[in-house]
């Protein structure tokens, strides 16, 4: 055995994945190639005397020096065949004493036999020195960024001090005004206005303290990240050659995996805590709403007046087989186009990453925030009144103004040159991200549409594979870049830097033109301006369009300055984006390129309308029992839409939270400007039924309440006086019992008020449909005049609903022959069974051409119906090639779970539809049924042959001629006979494999992986991970774990406080939980009420970010280091993570915080001040009244002194006299003066106070000589 050892780690084949095994084989072949070449070079030179060759137990060659009795791995002939130093190396050569080795878990590493050490870095590359220089440059830039944050902290602190002083001045003015409020001649200010100003100033101080606390947290976060980076640099420099050996690399890797497991478990705890916070927040909201208005219904019980009766008919049910298959093919084409668009957007985003350096946007944001803080401070100084200031204060304020103006000018000149281009790139990136999000929404809608076809056929598509191997599952043997540094919770919600810069520029341009406006007057002017905007004109008061009943706006050329309105998801063909408040329907089908229709939100319209009506004193509280309107009146007008959109416009899966009390049309009629649209004219004749639904989970009972009906005369005219009407309901299908209301003779507005309980389990309920029929009874004769069909699949068992439903007249219900299976469902069953039979026979080999042609007719039909394989082949081919790096080796576990789920769904569908296939085949007509090759087809008429020939002269495939509906022209009927159905269905350029007779079914050949390329000599073009990379990854994991534990602790504390508040029904904490924006953003991340489509969209966005990272890595030239990824690594440590809001000081007992303690003292001072002020006002009023009655001043003073014998409580000194006051400003006096004339006589003399005893800081108050009382 050689005594010169190397740290060789044994591989574990059972932990390796196929790509790693292939990479290991390539590395082994490369090493064998080097050994063979080395042996060929050494064969020219014999071994020196006394040397011998031997092999170790693992087959590795070592050399024996018999003279010195030593063994070594080095060949003594290397001194003749290898270069001596790195400068002498050419190409991939290593100098003498160096060896390249490979470990399956770590990868390539290098052995220095001369120094008897191992290292991860390639000694031939200088990537490590480049990394160290980049780290040093970033630390200097981060130091500048930290200085900006500290300067921002100083400016914010100055704003806080000036705001506190202004608050104290207003408090003093309010105290003076309160003492002389009884006489209007003595008061210089309105007491109510001063009191409002005082509240505004106090809120401003409180807000500035919160902002100061946030900046403090940002500074501490940045300092911690910089300290971590400094420690990493020092740790690497302390190592020998700045490199870790293989044993240390293995230990670091194992530690990272352990930390990752802790992160996974901690994230589960955090998600559970956030879900608990969502529930507590909802409970607090319910308590507050119930306390404020117990008569109104809870907003969580949504009221919907959307039409549940599809008057236009469901497209999926009315389309025949051919139209449905054409619709599915069109959807597939749209899906393919959107996928190409997504790939294009991803590529553009990958290009934009190189333009914007990581961390530069954060630095620009800090610069702009600093400028904005200085502008706000300048505006605060400009708004300060200088009348009551001393000369020293005026001089300090003017100097501060001049300095701020100079700083702002310099900052704008510097930022306009360097920040403008970066912000333009950032704005372009944001636009691309918005487009990508809209494209993902559209792709998701199309996937749902394709899944709806899968319920009738065997086509299935997985959301996990929709974008091609975008797996979130991490590798079991290594952590990738995306696993460590791409974390949605590791980054706080971003700030729109572009908008921030625009606002800062507007402030800078306007601060000189703006005059100081009194806060109270400014608020009053705003209120007057808002009230003046509401005109008494009936048209302007509603702020509506003509016709007022239709919220649809046709906007072919929208103004770029106005925000674009989003489209209804039903018309996703023109513009794909569904509104954020709706659950996207599964139909963005038709590919008609119609003009875009911008639809206003119905909920938004009603809220704005209600608010304006309340201002006009026309609004009435919402009442569910009000006269019902047509639900379609809340929908857009259907008459202006293209015919292709009509099939989707009337039935959507969304139920809007809209009241039925007031409509746009009714209000417009009241205002005198009634312009009804064409779509509203026939709706007044609709018959409606009000039905309430509620499910009791504990009892397993569905409560059906048949309340009332409206305008049933539109369905049937009573022919006799004794005619009555009743409602009958049943859960279909397979309903054993039905429920029935009492019979009434009122056909206009009958009130039934009947409630029934139907025992049924929840899983069965969601598969049922509630059918309510309107039945008339004349004597012994009964007749069904209308029907309401309600799908329980859309019913939310968590909510109780009370809705109006349109009744479809029985005259419009067509009568069909009693078939065992509808044609569309039968066609779907045929597709399912055919696909299942083809899947079960996938192992069977094809015997001959004749047998294939025999079954080609039926298989052609099934292929035209729903062949999913082409799309799946396209998805498989569009997956990016793996480059062998560790972050491209993720297991797609989520995709496998989705596929297993879909397989189970398809299997259930096959079992249900298999028994119906025979019935369908008997009822279906077949034009051609011969078992030979059929070359007949349906030809076009003679008059259209020329036009058809001009349009398309492509040859017709043989398999297309078997479809009876495939009408072609005889002039271009060129039948191309392929061997089988699978070949004809396959595009000529899709399959890279040649024909193999006797192989398995060739349809699966399209999914074979590409043949492995011949293994050639591998060049060192891959930049491996260095020791600095490993240390940064480890510290990043530790940082994430530290902040995760901190978040969990804060969330746990917040949960406990909110739980106690919920149990005690504390209104203050409930108001904070509802109004705090930071808390609302926090719970919005884990709100279970968020629709599943939004959660899936967030997952897709996360996967797309990882895909963009992979695309960007492919743009890095081979052999060049990835500079952007390394910059992202080091900027990760200074990015602020998700912040957990902290409760105010009055709700909790946190550690000592000087800012919060000062706030508490101010509150106590204010309470004492108000008590003393009330006492003084009462005494002052009595004194003035007695002075008017008695002219004798001496008797008056004696009586008042006897009356005011109890001394009022003394007022402590306000905190403005603390060292927090700005330099050069005198502390404001706490002694209020009654009038300017008495200021000289009524003064406060401060008592010398001991600094160690804060209780001695009191003022002695003298007696006012005019009124004879203490003030």
Curated annotation (Swiss-Prot):
Region listing for Disordered, in residue ranges: 1-51, 518-566, 838-899, 1143-1169, 1201-1265
The keyword Coiled coil appears for this protein: yes
Compartment annotation: Cytoplasm; Apical cell membrane
Gene3D superfamilies, per the entry: 2.20.70.10, C2 domain (2.60.40.150)
Chief location bin: cytoplasm
Coiled-coil stretches noted in the UniProt entry, renumbered to this chain: 192-223, 326-454, 1039-1066
Biased composition annotated in UniProt, kind: Low complexity: 18-43, 522-543, 850-862, 1218-1249
Biased composition (Pro residues): 1206-1217
The protein's assembly and partners: Forms a complex with Mer and Ex. Interacts (via domain WW 1) with Ex (via RXPPXY motif). Interacts with Mer, Sav, Hpo and Wts.
Protein name: Protein kibra
Gene designation: Kibra
């Amino acid at each position: 055995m050689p005594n010169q050892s190397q740290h060789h780690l044994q591989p574990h084949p059972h932990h390796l994945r196929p790509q790693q095994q292939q990479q290991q084989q390539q590395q082994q072949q490369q090493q064998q190639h080097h050994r063979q070449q080395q042996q060929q070079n050494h064969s020219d030179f014999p071994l020196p005397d006394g040397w011998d060759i031997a092999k170790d137990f693992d087959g590795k060659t070592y050399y024996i020096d018999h003279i010195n009795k030593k063994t070594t791995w080095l060949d003594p002939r290397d001194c003749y065949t290898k270069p001596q130093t790195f400068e002498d190396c050419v190409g991939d050569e290593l100098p003498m004493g160096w060896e390249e080795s490979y470990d399956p878990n770590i990868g390539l590493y290098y052995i220095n036999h001369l120094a008897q050490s191992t290292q991860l870095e390639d000694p031939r590359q200088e990537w490590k020195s480049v990394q160290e220089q980049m780290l040093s440059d970033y630390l200097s830039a981060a130091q500048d960024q930290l200085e900006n944050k500290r300067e921002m902290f100083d400016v914010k602190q100055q704003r806080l001090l000036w705001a506190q002083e202004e608050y104290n001045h207003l408090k003093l003015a309010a105290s003076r005004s309160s003492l002389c409020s009884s006489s209007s001649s003595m008061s210089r200010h309105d007491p109510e206005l001063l009191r409002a100003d005082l509240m505004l100033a106090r809120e401003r101080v409180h807000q500035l303290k919160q902002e100061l606390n946030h900046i403090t947290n940002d500074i501490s976060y940045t300092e911690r990240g910089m300290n971590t980076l400094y420690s990493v640099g020092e740790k690497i420099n302390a190592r020998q050659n700045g490199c870790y050996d293989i044993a240390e690399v293995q230990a670091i890797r194992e530690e990272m995996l352990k930390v990752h497991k802790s992160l996974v478990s901690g994230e589960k705890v955090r998600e559970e805590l956030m879900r608990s916070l969502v529930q507590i927040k909802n409970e607090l909201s319910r308590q507050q709403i119930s306390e404020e208005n117990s008569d109104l219904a809870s907003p969580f019980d949504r009221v919907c007046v959307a039409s549940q009766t599809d008057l236009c008919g469901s497209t999926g049910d009315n389309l025949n087989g051919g139209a449905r298959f054409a619709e599915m093919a069109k959807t597939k084409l749209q899906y393919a186009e959107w996928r190409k668009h997504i790939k294009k957007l991803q590529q553009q985003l990958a290009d934009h990453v190189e333009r914007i350096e990581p961390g530069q946007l954060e630095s620009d944001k800090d610069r702009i925030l600093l400028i904005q803080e200085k502008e706000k401070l300048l505006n605060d100084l400009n708004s300060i009144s200088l009348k009551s200031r001393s000369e020293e204060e005026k001089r300090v304020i003017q100097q501060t103004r001049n300095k701020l103006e100079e700083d702002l000018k310099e900052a704008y000149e510097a930022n306009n040159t360097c920040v403008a281009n970066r912000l333009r790139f950032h704005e372009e990136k944001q636009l691309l991200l918005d487009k990508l999000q809209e494209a993902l929404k559209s792709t998701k809608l199309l996937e749902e549409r394709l899944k709806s076809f899968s319920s009738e056929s065997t086509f299935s598509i997985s959301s996990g594979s929709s974008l091609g191997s975008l797996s979130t599952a991490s590798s079991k043997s290594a952590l990738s870049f995306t696993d460590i540094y791409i974390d949605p919770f590791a980054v706080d919600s971003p700030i729109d830097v572009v908008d921030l810069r625009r606002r800062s520029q507007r402030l800078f341009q306007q601060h000189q033109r703006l005059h100081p406006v009194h806060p109270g007057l400014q608020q009053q002017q705003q209120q007057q301006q808002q009230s003046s905007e509401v005109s008494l004109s009936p048209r302007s008061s509603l702020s509506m369009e003509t016709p007022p009943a239709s919220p649809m706006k046709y906007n072919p050329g929208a103004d770029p300055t106005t925000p674009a309105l989003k489209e209804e998801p039903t018309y996703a063909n023109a513009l794909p984006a569904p509104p954020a408040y709706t659950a996207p329907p599964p139909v963005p089908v038709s590919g008609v390129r119609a003009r875009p229709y911008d639809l206003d939100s119905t909920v938004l319209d009603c809220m704005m309308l209600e608010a304006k009506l309340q201002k006009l004193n026309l609004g009435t509280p919402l009442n569910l029992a009000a006269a019902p309107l047509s639900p379609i009146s809340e929908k857009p007008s259907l008459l202006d839409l293209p015919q292709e959109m009509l099939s989707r416009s009337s039935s959507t899966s969304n139920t809007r939270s809209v009241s039925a009390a007031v409509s746009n049309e009714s209000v417009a009629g009241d205002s005198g400007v009634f312009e009804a649209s064409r779509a509203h004219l026939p709706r007044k004749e609709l018959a409606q039924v009000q039905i309430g639904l509620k499910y009791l989970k504990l009892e397993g009972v569905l409560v059906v309440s048949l309340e009332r009906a409206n305008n049933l005369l539109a369905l049937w005219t009573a022919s006799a006086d004794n005619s009555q009407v009743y409602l009958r309901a049943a859960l279909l299908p397979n309903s054993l019992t039905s429920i029935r209301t009492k019979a009434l003779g009122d056909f206009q507005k009958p009130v039934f008020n009947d409630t029934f309980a139907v025992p049924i389990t929840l899983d069965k309920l969601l598969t049922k449909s509630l059918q309510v029929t309107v039945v008339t009874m004349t004597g012994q004769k009964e007749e069904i005049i209308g029907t309401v069909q309600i799908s329980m699949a859309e019913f939310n068992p968590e909510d109780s609903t009370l809705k109006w439903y349109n009744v479809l007249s029985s005259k419009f219900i067509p009568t069909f022959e009693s078939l065992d299976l509808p044609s569309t469902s039968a066609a779907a069953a045929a597709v399912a069974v055919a696909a299942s039979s083809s899947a079960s026979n996938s192992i069977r080999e094809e015997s001959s051409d004749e047998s294939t042609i025999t079954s080609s007719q039926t298989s052609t039909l099934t292929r035209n119906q729903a062949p999913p394989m082409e799309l799946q082949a396209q998805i498989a081919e569009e997956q990016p090639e793996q480059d062998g790096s560790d972050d491209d080796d993720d297991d797609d576990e989520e995709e496998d779970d989705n596929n297993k789920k879909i397989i189970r769904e398809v299997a259930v569908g096959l079992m249900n539809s298999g028994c119906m296939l025979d019935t369908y085949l008997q009822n279906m007509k077949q034009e051609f049924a011969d078992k030979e090759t059929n070359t007949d087809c349906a030809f076009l008429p003679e008059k259209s042959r020329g036009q058809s020939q001009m349009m398309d002269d492509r040859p017709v495939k043989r398999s297309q001629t078997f479809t009876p509906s495939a009408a072609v022209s005889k002039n271009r009927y060129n039948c191309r006979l392929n061997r089988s159905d699978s070949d004809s269905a396959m595009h000529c350029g899709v399959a890279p494999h040649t024909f193999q007779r006797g192989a398995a079914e060739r349809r699966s050949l399209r999914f074979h992986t590409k043949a492995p390329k011949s293994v050639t000599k591998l060049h060192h073009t891959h930049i491996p991970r260095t020791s600095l990379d490993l240390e940064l990854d480890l510290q990043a994991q530790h940082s994430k774990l530290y902040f995760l534990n901190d978040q969990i602790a804060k969330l746990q504390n917040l949960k406990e406080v909110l739980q106690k508040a919920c149990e005690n029904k504390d209104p203050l904490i409930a108001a904070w939980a509802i109004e705090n924006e930071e808390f609302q953003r926090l719970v919005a991340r884990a709100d279970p009420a968020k629709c599943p489509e939004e959660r899936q969209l967030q997952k897709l966005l996360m996967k797309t970010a990882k895909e963009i990272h992979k695309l960007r890595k492919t743009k890095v030239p081979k052999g060049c280091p990835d500079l952007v990824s390394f910059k992202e690594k080091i900027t990760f440590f200074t990015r602020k993570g998700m912040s957990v809001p902290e409760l105010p000081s009055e709700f909790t007992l946190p550690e000592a915080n000087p800012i919060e303690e000062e706030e508490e003292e101010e509150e106590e001072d204010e309470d004492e001040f108000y008590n003393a002020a009330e006492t003084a006002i009462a005494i002052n009023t009595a004194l003035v009244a007695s002075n008017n009655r008695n002219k004798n001043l001496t008797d008056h003073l004696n009586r008042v002194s006897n009356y005011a014998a109890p001394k009022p409580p003394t007022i402590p000194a306000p905190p403005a006299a603390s060292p927090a006051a700005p330099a050069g400003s005198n502390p404001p006096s706490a002694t209020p003066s009654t009038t300017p004339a008495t200021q000289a006589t009524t003064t406060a003399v401060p008592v010398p106070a001991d600094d160690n005893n804060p209780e001695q800081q009191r003022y002695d108050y003298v007696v006012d000589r005019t009124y004879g009382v203490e003030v």
